[in-house]
């Protein structure tokens, strides 16, 4: 019986101590003060680093104008900055792999939006309302055997 008293006293002492405080997980910030996020679209995956700067955007070690041939792609990638009114306030470095140009554009857009959301929580409502934080899960439907494409079938003849 004396052993049981000692154990219960230890437990009571632990319970009377300060309560445990759970640490909130840190946002993805590296040692250089950059916010990190990944974006996905179709088969493309983009890794995006965002830091306070002058508005430079580098994609796979090229400027955004060199990497994307069309100006419309550049405008859609800059959409999160237009919505949050932070054009020329952040520098972006991103690497993107897989997919085509359109999928890569969507992946970068998604990654930038997520990184901006981490940099300032005030932007969350704006980006969510603009539909930039949700991942576009549409992917190409697979081809079925016995058909020409995913939905296209050979011509049917009754007789």
Curated annotation (Swiss-Prot):
Protein name in the entry: Small ribosomal subunit protein uS9
Keyword field: Ribonucleoprotein, Ribosomal protein
Family membership noted in the UniProt record: Belongs to the universal ribosomal protein uS9 family.
PANTHER family the UniProt entry points to: RIBOSOMAL PROTEIN S9 (PTHR21569), SMALL RIBOSOMAL SUBUNIT PROTEIN US9M (PTHR21569:SF1)
Family matches, as PROSITE patterns: RIBOSOMAL_S9
Pfam families (alphabetical): Ribosomal_S9
GO BP: translation
Signal sequence residues: none
Source organism (scientific name): Rickettsia peacockii (strain Rustic)
Gene Ontology MF: a single term: RNA binding
GO cellular component term of the entry, any: cytosolic small ribosomal subunit
């Amino acid at each position: 019986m004396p052993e049981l008293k000692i154990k219960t006293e230890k437990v009571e002492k632990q319970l009377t101590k300060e309560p445990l405080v759970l640490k909130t997980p840190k946002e993805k910030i590296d040692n250089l003060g950059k916010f990190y996020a990944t974006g996905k679209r179709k088969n493309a995956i983009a890794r995006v680093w965002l830091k306070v700067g002058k508005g430079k955007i580098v994609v796979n070690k090229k400027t955004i104008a060199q990497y994307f041939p069309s100006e419309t792609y550049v405008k859609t990638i800059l959409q999160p900055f237009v919505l949050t009114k932070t054009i020329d306030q952040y520098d972006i470095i991103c690497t993107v792999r897989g997919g085509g140009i359109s999928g890569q554009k969507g992946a970068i857009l998604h990654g930038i939006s997520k990184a901006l959301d981490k940099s300032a929580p005030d932007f969350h409502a704006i980006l969510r309302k603009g539909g930039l934080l949700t991942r576009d899960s549409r992917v190409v439907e697979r081809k079925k055997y016995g058909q020409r494409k995913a939905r296209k079938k050979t011509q049917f003849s009754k007789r």
